[in-house]
């Protein structure tokens, strides 16, 4: 794999530590003790009525074109690192599993309606904490930029005047519309598309100059075509993956976290990371140790 395909663990932890500090700062309300008591009472009521872990089936919503976390294998079956994790969690809790490929734009509607139980597919939690109940984060990730090796693009600054593409409603898009909006303003265009497989087809054809994507997606593509692509050394951001549930489903989120920790303790997770190592998955980035 090209050396540019990897960010150092130290760089990730440094970036992630900054994010954790920012995300850990809360806003102190100006209301009196009555408002505080009401909030506490409401939270207690929600906790008392939460029976989300009382399930017999976990319906996992995922993007089927998001390797290595969820994709269609050579045998035509759904596979991927996250789907294997989910299957093992279900097995250990005697739950049936239903894998439900979804339109990523429709994920919130499907979750709120109960059509899916969770979103488990390289799902970034930063910036979404108020919209979902999350498991504890289980994997460190980052947003990066991939270009063609012969493009002459060597830094983020070199993207000025270039056409950049990313997935609709993705973490990369959120970064480029938020913290990195000034950078995006220098692009000739910032395009969005439904899946990353098509984005990389456009990069290969020359229709766009760069793809902004998850580190894991980058590593997967570079492993598949090491002579075609390279990853810029500068990362757009660092982030964490977690399993997203409907708001209020804390018991279920906690149960999944508890099971993932047990899977790490008995070596299952390490073996699974090794299985997907050629796809860019590294046990070094696993967080629930």
Model-found features: residue ranges?
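N-terminal secretory signal peptides
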Residues: 1-11, 15-26, 30
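Ligand-binding clefts/hinges and TM-proximal coupling segments of bilobed small-molecule sensing domains
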Residues: 25, 32, 171-191, 230-231, ...
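Bacterial lipoprotein signal-peptidase II cleavage site
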Residues: 27-41
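Extended ligand-binding regions for polar small-molecule ligands
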Residues: 31, 83-92, 158, 162, ...
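Periplasmic-binding protein-like
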Residues: 64, 140-147, 215, 219, ...
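Bilobed "Venus flytrap"/periplasmic-binding protein-like clamshell domains
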Residues: 64-67, 78-91, 123, 144-197, ...
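Acidic, polar ligand-binding/catalytic clefts
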Residues: 87, 96-158
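A ligand-binding cleft/hinge motif common to bilobed small-molecule-binding domains
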Residues: 106-109, 122-131, 175-178, 204-237
């Amino acid at each position: 794999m090209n050396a540019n395909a990897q960010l150092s663990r130290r760089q990730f932890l440094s970036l992630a530590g900054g994010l954790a500090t920012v995300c850990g700062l809360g806003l102190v309300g100006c209301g009196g003790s009555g408002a505080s008591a009401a909030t506490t009472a409401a939270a207690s009521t929600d906790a008392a009525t939460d029976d989300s872990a009382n399930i017999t089936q976990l319906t996992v919503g995922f993007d089927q074109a998001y390797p290595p976390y969820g994709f269609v294998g050579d045998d035509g079956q759904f596979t991927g690192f996250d789907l294997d994790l989910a299957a093992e969690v279900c097995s250990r809790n005697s739950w049936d599993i239903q894998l439900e490929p979804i339109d990523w734009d429709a994920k919130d509607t499907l979750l709120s309606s109960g059509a899916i139980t969770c979103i488990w597919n390289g799902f970034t939690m930063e910036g979404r904490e108020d919209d979902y109940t999350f498991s504890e984060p289980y994997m460190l990730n980052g947003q990066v930029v991939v270009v063609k090796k012969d493009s002459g693009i060597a830094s983020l600054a070199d993207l000025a005047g270039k056409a950049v593409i990313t997935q609709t409603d993705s973490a990369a898009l959120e970064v480029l519309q938020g913290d990195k909006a000034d950078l995006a303003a220098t692009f000739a265009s910032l395009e969005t598309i439904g899946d990353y497989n098509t984005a990389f087809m456009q990069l290969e054809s020359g229709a766009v100059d760069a793809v902004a994507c998850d580190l894991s997606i980058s590593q997967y593509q570079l492993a598949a075509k090491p002579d075609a692509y390279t990853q810029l050394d500068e990362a757009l951001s660092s982030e964490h993956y977690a399993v997203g549930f409907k708001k209020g489903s804390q018991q279920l989120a906690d149960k999944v976290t508890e099971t993932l920790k047990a899977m790490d303790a008995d070596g299952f997770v390490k073996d699974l990371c090794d299985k997907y190592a050629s796809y860019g998955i590294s046990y070094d980035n696993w967080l629930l140790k």
